[in-house]
Amino acid sequence: MDIALSYQEKGSGEPLILLHGNGEDSSYFRHQIAHFQDRYRVIALDTRGHGKSPRGSAPFTIRQFARDLYDFMETRKIAEAVLLGFSDGANIAMRFAMEHPERVKALILNGGNLDPAGVKRSTQLPIEIGYRIARHFAARSAEARKNAEMLGL
């Protein structure tokens, strides 16, 4: 892995890895961390380019985020974990489970969608417009480049 992921860890026991949505970070799960830390080893990641985790040079894709999760688990000697993902975090968890089913004890998913074909046009259109605007200004603004990259997930 070309970066070190930032994370919060609380509690002990069976690993429960929390994966946030696009544009969020591990603080999204502050209430879940507090709730589950008495029963689990709760690990809330900041995925690549989110929160305190650096962007790095690898592709900014769900597939890469799943690779990062694998590397994170390998480095910390986590053989198997419960994965809880929200939105793009659910997408990361699903991708990871497809590629490494032996590493997943259970999946808890909310709002995941690996195939956006089922998303209502009224929901998708503002994202597409925002992406196009950000791409237009990406050459002149680092913030616009970052927004375009996130909206492109």
Model-derived segments and their meaning:
Residues F65, L83-G85, N110:
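Short beta-strand immediately N-terminal to the catalytic nucleophile in serine-hydrolase-like folds
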Residues G118-S122, H136-L153:
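Conserved alpha/beta-hydrolase catalytic His-Asp/Glu region
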Residues Q64-A81:
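Conserved acidic catalytic loop of the alpha/beta-hydrolase fold
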Residues G85, G89, A93:
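Gly/Ala-rich beta-loop-alpha elbow adjacent to hydrolase catalytic centers
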Residues M1-A4:
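N-terminal cap/lid segment of alpha/beta-hydrolase-fold proteins
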Residues M94-E99, K105-F137:
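Flexible "cap/lid" loop of the alpha/beta hydrolase fold
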Residues S6-A58, F72:
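Conserved HGGG/HGGXW glycine-rich cap/lid loop of the alpha/beta-hydrolase fold
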Residues D46, V82, K105-I108:
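Residue in the alpha/beta-hydrolase core beta-strand immediately N-terminal to the catalytic nucleophile
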